[in-house]
Amino acid sequence: MTKRTFGGTSRKRKRVSGFRVRMRTHTGRSVIRSRRKKGRSRIAV
């Protein structure tokens, strides 16, 4: 059997796609807006 190679790093995940990073740019804010509009329980990581 092969190993699961993807571990996942919380710090990197937050830095790349966290809420504060999204709010920095216009497109990021639009992402948050659209996810709120859709009714996602998690708008950002």
UniProtKB/Swiss-Prot annotation:
Disordered: region residues: 1-45
MF-aspect GO terms: structural constituent of ribosome
GO CC, one annotated term: ribonucleoprotein complex
UniProt-listed PROSITE patterns: RIBOSOMAL_L34
Protein biosynthesis is among the record's keywords: no
Compositional bias annotation for Basic residues: 10-45
Record's signal peptide: none
Ribosomal protein found in the keyword field: yes
Keywords: Ribonucleoprotein, Ribosomal protein
Pfam families, A to Z: Ribosomal_L34
GO BP terms: translation
InterPro entries attached to this UniProt entry: Ribosomal_bL34, Ribosomal_bL34_CS
HAMAP family (alphabetical): Ribosomal_bL34
NCBIfam families per the UniProt record, alphabetical: rpmH_bact (TIGR01030)
Family in the record: Belongs to the bacterial ribosomal protein bL34 family.
Protein name: Large ribosomal subunit protein bL34
Organism: Prochlorococcus marinus (strain SARG / CCMP1375 / SS120)
Lineage, broadest ranks: Bacteria, Bacillati, Cyanobacteriota, Cyanophyceae, Synechococcales
